[in-house]
Structures are given as C-alpha cells and as structure tokens.
Amino acid sequence: MRLGRLGVEDVYDENYKFEFGKGNVLRKGSKVAIIASGLMVQESLKAYELLESKPTVIDIPTIKPIDKELIIETAKTHDVIVTVEEHNIYGGLGSAVSEVLAPEGIACRQYMLGMRDVFGRSGKPKELLDYYGLDAKHIKELIIEL
C-alpha cells in the first residue's frame, strides 16, 4: 500500500542537504525510537507532539543503502525501536532494520507498524491511514502501550 496521493509536508528547513544513504534524527527523545520513511515521517512527528514521554523520531529517506550506523547507535541507546511504514511489514523498513541489528548481535525490542500481509483496500488516504492504524493517533497509542 502506498498513499502517495496525500501531500507530504516538508520536515526539513531550506538549508537541509540530502545525503544518499544517511538517516536524520528529527526529534531527540528517550526509551522509544520511531524510524519511518516518506509520509510516515510526517505522521510520526504528529504522534511525537501528542505524546508526553517523547520518542526519538528518525527519517530514513533511503532503504537501500540504509544508514546502518544510525540504526545501530539508536538500538544501543533506546529500549524499543518502532518502525512505521505504509507498506507490508514483511520485506520493508522494519525488516531492513532487523537485518542491520541481527548480525551485530544487538538485542533491542522492535515493533513493526505497517500492513500485516493483507490485501489492501481502496479508500480515501486519510481513512486508510486510520483503518490500518498508521495515523498519528494510532502511532501514539502504540507508543503508550510499549
């Protein structure tokens, strides 16, 4: 599922320079880190604003190559990593993060928020985000449960 029909707000200022293969820490928090890409970065930042206990929010603009150093450092300094993607959780961003951490022997709890290997349905983008639990409200609720 891709909801590219929605306009995505710019999360960077005019001085930002894209660096291929490098992720960016957009908000610094503790205990929980949210790693997202694309539209899900915007929803993750909205969830950040709704939460009292602030998570770290990381934008991973490229999945291949992925920023291994940032992911490893994040896993070492947080209790839980939550990946958020408008994609099947199998073979997506969450899997890529797991593939970075497993060979390093880093034991960090991970939760993958995304499509659970189901056929997508049609609808308005915001309604689909809500239906699949990918909007800021659902991200916030998941973080509180962790």
Model features per residue range: what roles?
Residues 1:
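Active-site donor-nucleotide binding/catalytic segment of nucleotide-sugar enzymes
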Residues 4-146:
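Thiamine diphosphate
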